Amino acid sequence: QITPAQLDAVNDCAKSLASLAEVIVVIGIGGSYLGAKAVLEAMSDPFQLLHKKQDKPIVLFAGQNLSEDYLYELLAATKPYKLAAIVISKSGTTTEPAVAFRIVKEEIETRYGKAEAAKRIVAVTDAKRGALRTLATQEGYATFVIPDDIGGRYSVLTPVGLLPLAVAGINIGELVRGAQDMAKMTAADVPFDENPAVQYAAARNALYKKGYKIEILASYDPRLQYVSEWWKQLYGESEGKEGKGIFPASVTLTADLHSMGQ
């Protein structure tokens, strides 16, 4: 459970980055970025880039693919803007974010020099070990820890998700309080008929035992598309072992009614 002191540290770091940069690239893959991406998309104006005044940095994502076009175009688009980065990886050796970070790091160092670049890069990684922890120590990056007992896909309420969200202007204190309220509503001692999490788990298990192997999550707002992607990460990675588990898929309605719903 994140403490008020940890929230303050995340907010302070976010303010520091925001004072230095107009664009902040968040580098990660899978659970290391999908939680933050889902919350950011769900809580943001989809047309905010058209507003004349930007009072918060623009948050972009990298390291979630190996497309050379994507990285080239990202760096080209950010040339006119002051740049910073948040790199998220437990080990620092996951291929996609490792490649993206090397390229973004080189861009920042070329622009500002190594000393100034170190102020513009924050690493979220293991407390003691791993390639990214070693590099962060050598370069003097500010760092936050990925807790040992929390997998990446569950980490949105740790600095993994909270730092990118705070940079984007999301009130992370309110977000955490909302999660705490929901945790109380779904605690193990809450009766079945009042507990939506237990009801959902029971329904999934009953249908799985009847032979249903595919579950489709439908959303009705484009801003929830990445909530669906995060949901697929949560269930696909958690249950998809040894040929077991329900296959998670998603549709965005009403658009997908004209394809998947035919």
Where are these regions (language model features)?
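Short glycine-rich or small-residue beta-strand-to-loop segments that form or flank ligand, phosphate
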Residues: V23-G30, A84-S91, V122, I214-D221
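Conserved phosphate/anionic-ligand binding catalytic regions in large, soluble enzymes, centered on
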Residues: I24-V39, Y154-G161
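FAD-binding core of FAD-dependent oxidoreductases
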Residues: G31-G35, L66, S91-T93, L163
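Conserved strand-to-helix beginnings and helix N-cap segments that scaffold or border functional pockets
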Residues: A36-K37, Y72, P97-F101, R133, ...
